[in-house]
From Swiss-Prot:
Stated name of the protein: Small ribosomal subunit protein uS14
GO BP: any one term: translation
Disulfide bonds: none
Pfam families: Ribosomal_S14
Record's subunit section: Part of the 30S ribosomal subunit. Contacts proteins S3 and S10.
Coiled coil: none
GO cellular component: cytoplasm; small ribosomal subunit
Domain of life: Bacteria
Length: 101
């Protein structure tokens, strides 16, 4: 199990990313636009750097919904590989069964 503080930190990052998404996208569009003057682009870069670091989506980590485990995460289920296996063995995931060939 991940520490509660680590789970809370990821929730905080997700909220910040959602809050600053539009502002960040607007500034990134200015930075990548070649028709904008160099001064305006530089100002956009500086403004982008002043945004909170945790507002960047790349700072988020995929975590298991049940345990908060950051490694072995399967996006399709939102769970870690361990919890997916346990749920599959109990028959809780429809259509998922153990491979046999």
């Amino acid at each position: 199990m991940a520490k509660k503080s680590m789970k809370a930190r990821d929730v905080k990052r997700a909220n910040l990313a959602e809050k600053f998404f539009a502002k960040r996208a607007e500034l990134k569009a200015i930075v990548s636009d070649v028709n904008v003057s160099d001064e305006d682009r530089w100002n956009a870069v500086l403004k982008l750097q002043t945004l909170p670091r945790d507002s960047s989506p790349s700072r988020q980590r995929n975590r298991c919904r049940q345990t908060g485990r950051p490694h072995g995460f399967l996006r399709k289920f939102g769970l870690s590989r361990i919890k997916v296996r346990e749920a599959a063995m109990r028959g809780e995931i429809p259509g998922l069964r153990k491979a046999s060939w």
